[in-house]
């Protein structure tokens, strides 16, 4: 079995780690950073940029730069959370009803594909570090992700060419990283406020056992919402001052969003920051600049309601675990937003103790995922992880009532069966609608999918016995079966949401990813040969200036023509022209050898004029050494 990696696929940033012996290692990306922005950009030339390079060009390519797509993964376009989505790129309803994204040239991508591009980048970073192919991975998701979102994340891993060993809840992974060396039993809370989601989990840790007692959260609450609060404030203030609404200017909006995020981060350590965006727009009177100061107090007033929203899940998790805040031994902070002083203050106020600050909130989840990979592969022993399902799972019964079969916070993997019957006389088929949530009516909960059990013998209502079995695996993904106990007929399905990616779509995306990898390799070769061409043209032109009069007119003309031909072919942006450029490079390299000979002869003449002739002075030891060196070089040149 090859090495397995742990990946934190975040809304804002992603991170990859690996076990090395008993230690964990966070792997740096190509830019040398330990985290990678979860941003994918498609350029006009067809190039795909991931991470920091994608972020750098976002201002000028906002409509084709996809960020925070984790908020879309596994979601239907009609979901209520989609209404308040504020992004510069196009989000639309795919045929399945899922929320997908679209470029300006109408190329369509599922959020799982965008996630796969980021996972691929993590995979490549790990392979570059290890020097070997990586196939296996543990990927983390927010604890409050539903079945559709978990399945969509697993699909992203498959598209990226990874065998997903396990889907692990982010707070649980963080607890693993925090508590692996803790021997004495105690209860902890993991408060995870990231870029797009909020989770809180309560765990008991002791003697290598990590048992999740309860989990709660909000899959649409995170740093993006804090940024949007600042953006709205800046837009309103600018409109008051200048009478111009910038909401419909994508480039201005992107600049403001970046400035808002930067200001938010700075105010975690400073009391005041200045936002200065020159030439943000223009009107008849000339260019307009956005320049204003933002204090920490003002930021806190803008986002206070968001911080307050994290308290309700904390209360619910404590209730579900049957604990009070005073019974919590440690509060572990995870996610970049937990660096905000007001968040730390609120957590301290709620739990009555200073939060533990000994883990890196940006890296701890990936480290925990790497530990889980080590557990699965047998590299980490004597550790048992008992996670829970975050939401109740059940079916729709008579009258549209939601009947849970597996209650929330049930330890997984788990399996449960219940017998139901028909609602009408002589009913020969039943449709099983599977829902996930906590509301009393099925329609108010998330419909995960449905299937039919047919061929039931006609009988009075209530007599047939239909056994419905729910099986939730360690990934938190459900498998459901229905069986007619009289006939033994059974229908099994792995829950696939009413939307979701079909196997054919996943296979197509896997193939596209493989083809794109080949194209990326061609593009890399193309860039390398263009750089080689530019360098050769520069050095040849420099040599022509200095030594052009030392070669024959015919040779000089041939070299100049070759330089012009290489310049012309190098203007191409078509990656298929790499071989043509390489041929011109080879041709110019061969012709410019004449210049090399001229350079050598000039150097030889200069040496002779300075007294270092081949005759030398037999009575001068230093000249004998020079004479010997000169003869060696001369002989080598003759042998060429």
Curated annotation (Swiss-Prot):
GO terms for molecular function: ATP binding; ATP-dependent protein folding chaperone; unfolded protein binding. Coiled coil: none annotated. Keywords: ATP-binding, Chaperone, Nucleotide-binding, Phosphoprotein, Stress response. Residues 537-556, 596-640 are annotated as: Disordered. Pfam families: HSP70. Residues 600-617 have a biased composition (Polar residues). The keyword ATP-binding applies. Induction: By stress conditions e.g. heat shock. Gene3D superfamilies: 1.20.1270.10, 3.30.420.40, Actin, Chain A, domain 4, Substrate Binding Domain Of DNAk, Chain A, domain 1. The modification Phosphothreonine is found at residue 197. InterPro entries: ATPase_NBD, Chaperone_DnaK, Heat_shock_70_CS, HSP70_C_sf, HSP70_peptide-bd_sf, Hsp_70_fam. Acts as a chaperone. This is Chaperone protein DnaK.
């Amino acid at each position: 079995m090859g090495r397995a990696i742990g990946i934190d696929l975040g809304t804002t940033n992603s991170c990859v780690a690996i076990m090395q012996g008993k230690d964990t290692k966070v792997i740096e990306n190509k830019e040398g950073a330990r985290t990678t922005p979860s941003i994918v950009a498609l350029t006009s030339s067809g190039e795909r940029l991931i991470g920091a390079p994608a972020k750098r060009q976002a201002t000028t390519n906002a409509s084709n730069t996809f960020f925070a797509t984790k908020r879309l993964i596994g979601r239907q376009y009609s979901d209520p959370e989609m209404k308040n989505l504020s992004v510069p790129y196009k989000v639309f309803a795919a045929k399945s009803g899922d929320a997908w994204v679209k470029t300006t040239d109408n190329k369509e991508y599922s959020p799982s594909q965008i996630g796969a591009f980021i996972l691929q980048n993590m995979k490549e970073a790990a392979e570059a570090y290890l020097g070997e192919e990586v196939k296996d991975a543990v990927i983390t998701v927010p604890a409050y992700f539903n079945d559709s979102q978990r399945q969509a994340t697993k699909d992203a891993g498959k598209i990226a060419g990874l065998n997903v060993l396990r889907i692990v809840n982010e707070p649980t992974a963080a607890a693993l990283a925090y508590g692996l060396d803790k021997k004495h039993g105690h209860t902890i809370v993991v408060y995870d406020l990231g870029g797009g989601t909020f989770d809180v989990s309560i765990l008991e840790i002791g003697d290598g056992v990590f048992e999740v007692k309860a989990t709660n959260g909000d899959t649409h609450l995170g740093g993006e919402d804090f940024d949007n609060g600042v953006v709205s404030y800046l837009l309103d203030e600018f409109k008051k001052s200048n009478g111009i609404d910038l909401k419909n200017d994508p480039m201005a909006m992107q600049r403001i969003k970046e400035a808002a995020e930067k200001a938010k981060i700075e105010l975690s350590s400073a009391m005041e920051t200045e936002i200065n965006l020159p030439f943000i727009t223009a009107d008849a009177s000339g260019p307009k600049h956005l320049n204003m100061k933002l204090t920490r107090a003002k930021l806190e007033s803008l986002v206070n309601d968001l911080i307050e929203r994290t308290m309700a899940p904390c209360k619910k998790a404590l209730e579900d675990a049957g604990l009070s805040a005073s019974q919590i031994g440690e509060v572990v902070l995870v996610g970049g937003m937990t660096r905000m002083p007001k968040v730390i203050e609120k957590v301290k106020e709620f739990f009555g103790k200073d939060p533990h600050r000994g883990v890196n909130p940006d890296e701890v989840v990936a480290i925990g995922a790497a530990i889980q990979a080590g557990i699965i592969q047998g590299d980490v022993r004597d550790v048992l992880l008992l996670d829970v399902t975050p939401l109740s799972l059940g079916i729709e019964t008579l009258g549209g009532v939601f009947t849970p079969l597996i209650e929330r916070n049930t330890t997984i993997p788990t399996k449960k069966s219940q017998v139901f019957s028909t609602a009408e006389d002589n009913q020969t088929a039943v449709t099983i609608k599977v829902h996930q949530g906590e509301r009393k009516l099925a329609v108010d909960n998330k419909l995960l999918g449905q299937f039919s059990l047919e061929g039931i013998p006609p009988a009075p209502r209530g007599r047939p016995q239909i056994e419905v079995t729910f099986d939730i695996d360690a990934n938190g993904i459900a498998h459901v079966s229905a069986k007619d106990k009289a006939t033994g007929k059974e229908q099994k399905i792995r829950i696939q949401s009413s939307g979701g990616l079909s196997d054919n779509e996943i296979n197509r995306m896997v193939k596209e990813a493989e083809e794109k990898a080949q194209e990326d390799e061609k593009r890399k070769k193309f860039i390398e040969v263009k750089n080689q061409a530019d360098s050769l043209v520069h050095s040849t032109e420099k040599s022509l200036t200095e030594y052009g009069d030392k070669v024959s007119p015919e040779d000089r003309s041939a070299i100049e023509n070759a330089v012009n031909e290489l310049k012309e072919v190098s203007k191409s942006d078509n990656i298929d022209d790499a071989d043509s450029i390489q041929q011109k490079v080879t041709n110019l390299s061969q012709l410019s050898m004449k210049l090399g000979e001229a350079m050598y002869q000039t150097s030889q003449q200069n040496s002779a004029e300075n007294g270092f002739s081949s005759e030398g002075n037999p009575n001068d030891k230093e000249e004998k050494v020079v004479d010997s060196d000169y003869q060696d070089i001369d002989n080598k040149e003759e042998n060429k």
